[in-house]
Amino acid sequence: MSTAILAPGSRGRRLSKRLLQVVITLFGLLLLTFTIGRVMPIDPVLAIVGPDADQSTYQQVYQQLGFDKSLTTQFGIYFVNLLHGDLGNALLTGKPVVDDIIRVFPATMELATMAIIVGAGLGIPLGVLAAARRNSVSDYVVRIISLAGYSTPIFWVGMMGLLVFYAWLGWVGGAVRVDLGLDGVVPRRTGLITVDALLAGNGQVFWNAINHLILPASLLGFHSLAYISRMTRSFMLAQLSQEFIITARVKGLTERQVIWNHAFRNILVQLLTVVALAYGALLEGAVLIETVFSWPGFGSYLTGSLLLGDMNAVMGCVLLVGVIFVMLNLLSDMLYQFFDPRTKS
């Protein structure tokens, strides 16, 4: 067994190469993020001391932050601090950036998780339907939905969603995670309000959080629905043109069996990759939705940091998004190699 793992072309060797690529990619991302943070036309020293500070105060803070050193030296210091889990302090809160990210990220994760459930739960069946009924009314409707999801600005969708479903109809909660009277009622354990409410056995907070989560998650999931349905349709059309599908139909299998038991089963591995990457994109795309819904998550934190010129926080956020994308990509590759029998040969 060990010989097979070490053999050229084996899954073990491919995984080792992939891990090496991940390390190189993350280092390149770190270097790029640091460089952009230093060349952007934003003065973090001025953001700290304020516009009314005198030159001596400005120069003192400038030296304390290490900006008087070369870029190479600054990057070395930043890299060493990063290895120790230190991303610096945030101007917005005065706390370590790592602590801030740990505090705000669960809110975004909860939103993105619900959004991917909506996007994949609707996008996959719609994509299968469109492929099974190619060039029919159903196919055209699904393609129009997909196009609308790609082209409609998410900020506008969020504003219209709040106006219609909250202000006019009153079907969902407003632009917060829970009602103000229920905020802080359950102890924070995971940062995910729905999970914390379940752990505390508080059904009122749980359903209130769901009521506030439905609208932003559905609107955010609409964009992933467009991508997932389009990719599912493409994968299914490729499978339905294969000879084994024709053979299955000749043998008398029902169309339902052909679609779900043969064609759809063969695209599951590809869909894993699509859904994983869509989930990573949702974590990034949550910035605008969180702004509209006053959602105290990662996106709102990043927006506030950008407006303040807080480069420590911005670089930490950008680095985290990059790490998430790289790790999700690696995970999808590992799942692909594990489940796809063609990678075993």
Q: What role is predicted for each listed range?
A:
Residues 9-15, 26, 105-138, 154, ...:
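Alpha-helical transmembrane segments of integral membrane proteins
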Residues 1-11, 46, 68-124:
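An internal, D/E-rich "acidic patch" concept
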Residues 129-152, 157, 164-168:
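Short loop segments and helix-boundary regions at transmembrane helix junctions
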